[in-house]
UniProtKB/Swiss-Prot annotation:
PANTHER family: SHORT-CHAIN DEHYDROGENASE TIC 32, CHLOROPLASTIC-LIKE (PTHR48476:SF1). Part of the Tic complex. Residues 301-317 are annotated as: Interaction with calmodulin. It comes from Brassica napus. Keywords: Calmodulin-binding, Chloroplast, Membrane, NADP, Oxidoreductase, Plastid, Plastid inner membrane, Protein transport, Transport. This is Short-chain dehydrogenase TIC 32 A, chloroplastic.
Length: 320
């Protein structure tokens, strides 16, 4: 991701750039044959992605901890597009129990699943353990989505097989994945308050999203499954994620105002990777400004990715 492109909005090889919006990158795409789950689809990038996918005809399931906010989002989209197909299901990604409950609710709908957008997240939170005893940013941003994705894979595989339509998983990562702990993932001390850094813990969780994508991409390719998984950096956007940030972030934003995007621009890369036909068979990549870019060395470390995969499997299997 080049600074020049970020500032000027100049399009990259894909034909899109930092100034492109979610509507721009999905122009003329007909998604009526697709069903998508979007986690955290009640505000910011998630809501914009839900709106645009709904506008393009996809059946959108908004998965959110706050059911009122989800229903309000649904009503807003329906007011704009009365024929949109929007459903809402409750999902708290910080809770293993809630993730498993969501799976039961979704499977009961008896619909296919073509697109999974793992968008929800928390950022820069004070140290706190989830109800399962996992540091909250790691629990919500990685473990919850890791389990959700694994439990939805059979449905995605059968949908891809029966329809012939490529399934797509989009993990919302961040350039913040480059700012993590010295060892990348602090496996032995994830729940240690004495070693906790709000910003590094966030970076660790975003690195985990990338490692998860890359490990699962390799596994799906080995199986010969018609499903891709990619990671995206949305850009610098002011959303509800910043509710835990302080004065320092306000100063940073004031000094770098020319790099920040609005929400329609911030949702562009997510929607591009989820829907654009040019990305057929593209998997295991990291996108920013709707173009493939290079992540950190940690992010492409297959040994680290496999270690995180095994760690995550053991962790979720140890919980009821």
């Amino acid at each position: 991701m080049e600074i020049y492109g970020m500032v000027t909005g100049k399009a990259g090889k894909s034909g899109y750039g930092s100034a492109s919006t979610a509507e721009d990158v999905t122009h003329s795409i007909d998604a009526k044959h697709l069903t998508a789950i979007i986690t955290g689809g009640t505000s910011g990038i998630g809501l914009e992605a839900a709106r645009v996918l709904g506008m393009r005809g996809a059946h959108v399931i908004i998965a959110s901890r706050n059911t009122k906010a989800a229903n309000d989002s649904k009503e807003m989209i329906l007011q704009m597009y009365p024929n949109a197909r929007i459903d809402c299901l409750q999902l708290d990604l910080s809770s293993i129990k809630s993730v498993r409950s969501f799976i039961h609710q979704f499977l009961a709908l008896n619909v296919p699943l073509n697109i999974l957008i793992n968008n929800a997240g928390v950022m820069f939170c004070p140290f706190q353990l989830s109800e399962d005893g996992i540091e909250s940013q790691f629990a919500t941003n990685h473990i919850g989505h890791f389990l959700l994705t694994n439990l939805l894979l059979d449905k995605m595989k059968s949908s891809a097989r029966e329809s012939g339509i490529e399934g797509r998983i989009v993990n919302l990562s961040s350039i913040a994945h480059t700012y993590t702990y010295t060892e990348g993932i602090m496996f032995d001390y994830i729940n240690d308050p004495d070693r906790y850094s709000e910003k590094k813990a966030y970076g660790q969780s975003k690195l985990a999203n990338l490692l998860h994508s890359n490990a699962l991409s390799r596994k799906l390719q080995e199986e010969g499954v018609n499903i891709t998984i990619n990671s995206v950096h949305p850009g610098l956007i002011t959303t509800n994620l910043f509710r835990h940030s302080g004065l320092g972030m306000a100063v940073l934003k004031a000094m770098s105002f020319f790099l920040w995007k609005n929400i329609p621009q911030g949702a562009a890369t997510t929607c591009y990777v989820a829907l654009h036909p040019d990305l057929k068979d593209v998997t295991g990549k990291y996108f920013a400004d709707c173009n493939v870019t290079t992540p950190s060395n940690f992010a492409i470390d297959t040994t680290l990715a496999d270690k995180l995969w095994d760690f995550s499997i053991k962790l979720v299997e140890s919980l009821p």
